[in-house]
Amino acid sequence: MAGIAQVTQGGPKTFTPADNEVILGGKLVEARAGGRIGIAAAGSTKVLGVALTDALAPEDFPGANGTDALGRPVISAAPVPTSVAVAYGGAEVKVTYSANAAFGDKLVATAAGTVAPAGATPDARTIVGVCTEPAGVVVATKDVGLMRTA
């Protein structure tokens, strides 16, 4: 191949949520059919990164003078986002932890787009990042902490 065009450099990359998916910033997202994304399931091997914004699928956009799936009023002056910026490839972002994690722990996806420390012998495809919260994360006191994406 004589030359190629670079598609992205460092991200984030924008995706459209899958039908009936409510994407919230700070949650892990995974690849879905048709080039769309959804909230990552526990143990997912298709995690793309961390959502930086909230959004709905375009087909789920509510009618005028209603509320969206996030409970926000919908008026013509405040459209609901239908695309999501996703951080990946070494980005450091805040995520929600489902279990306590120490600084430096390798992390895997857990239910509802959250993260937890990997077990002793995880499938390498399930590692989504590293805990970079300096004091670690203690879920009972604060379940949000820093993670560097894989």
Regions found by a protein language model. Name each.
Residues 1-150:
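Surface-exposed, low-hydrophobicity beta-strand/loop segments enriched in small/polar/acidic residues
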